[in-house]
């Protein structure tokens, strides 16, 4: 089937997706954002110091950079190294894919990104072959009708993405089924009061669910979709064990999303098979524990004093 991509403005991500179209069309006053990737972490150490707060940190692994925002005022060299490797890896994948779709060399695509084309005249996008034509929104339907071979006064049977998502899934009446289990978010031991477990991976809930899947004779295999940067080491350990127990009864396949790192990788590594995307952040680079030292705020700034009587 043919695909026509059209946009008034293409963000970099949108252009990456739409570049696979047979034709990429742009509004005559539209823009294409194509300028490379950047990472810009922020650091709270000096801000906390103004309030008399500092972090006590214990960590294993020089690349475990998550606590740096609380303990440093700039990126450590190991963190700079890994972030650079990551964003360059993603950019290389994007450039390679667009190069194949648009028949533009990777060297040229990098030159275009360096040129600041995002704010260029729209005709520049034609010249660089990033788009095929400049077309007003009102003309798109007629172009599609022409492509379909129908008259201009006839209507097109259209279906939006939101309408497609509302369509009911076909009922599976087969006796043998493959379960797809989604594990998205931060890994926690228990869901906090006032929050729901749809935005995090609750270790106790996941282990119970995996146990039920293991005991369901209609389920012949399980696909575990993981998208998590990690969290509780205890919960990760329990889920890893649950995956191993599940694997004893039926095949377990992990499909990794944008991230399956630290505890997200830990819970995955017990599976029979693991599949990741070229841009997935995965692996484990260490652990850390961190406790805020509030003495500078409470004692020095607020004047709160403590005394103690104890038995041991």
Each model region followed by its residue ranges:
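RNase H-like polynucleotidyl transferase catalytic core
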Residues: 254-256
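Small-residue-centered hinge/linker elements
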Residues: 1-114, 119, 145-250, 259-312
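Terminal amphipathic helices with adjacent charged low-complexity linkers/tails
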Residues: 133, 141-147
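Short, contiguous alpha-helical
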Residues: 125
């Amino acid at each position: 089937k043919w695909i026509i991509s059209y946009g008034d403005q293409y963000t970099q991500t949108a252009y990456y997706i739409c570049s696979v179209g047979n034709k990429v069309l742009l509004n005559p006053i539209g823009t294409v954002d194509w300028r490379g990737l950047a990472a810009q972490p922020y650091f709270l150490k000096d801000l906390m110091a103004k309030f008399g707060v500092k972090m006590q940190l214990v960590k294993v692994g020089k690349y475990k950079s998550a606590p740096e925002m609380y303990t440093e005022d700039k990126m450590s060299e190991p963190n700079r190294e890994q972030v650079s490797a990551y964003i360059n890896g993603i950019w290389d994948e994007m450039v390679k894919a667009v190069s194949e779709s648009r028949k533009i060399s990777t060297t040229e695509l990098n030159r275009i990104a360096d040129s600041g084309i995002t704010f260029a005249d729209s005709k520049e996008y034609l010249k660089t072959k990033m788009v095929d034509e400049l077309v007003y929104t009102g003309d798109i339907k007629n172009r599609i009708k022409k492509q379909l071979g129908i008259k201009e006064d006839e209507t097109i049977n259209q279906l939006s993405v939101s309408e497609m998502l509302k369509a009911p899934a076909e009922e599976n009446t087969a006796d043998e089924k493959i379960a797809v289990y989604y594990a998205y978010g931060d890994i926690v031991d228990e869901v906090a009061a006032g929050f729901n477990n749809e935005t995090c991976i609750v270790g106790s809930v996941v282990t119970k669910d995996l146990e039920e899947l293991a005991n369901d004779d209609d389920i012949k295999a399980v696909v575990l979709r993981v998208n998590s940067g990690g969290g509780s080491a205890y919960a990760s350990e329990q889920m890893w064990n649950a995956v191993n127990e599940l694997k004893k009864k039926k095949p377990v396949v992990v499909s990794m999303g944008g991230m399956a790192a630290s505890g997200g990788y830990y819970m995955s590594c017990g599976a029979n098979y693991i599949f990741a995307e070229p841009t997935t952040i995965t692996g484990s680079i260490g652990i850390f524990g961190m406790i805020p030292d509030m003495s500078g705020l409470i004692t020095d700034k607020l004047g709160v004093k403590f005394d103690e009587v104890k038995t041991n």
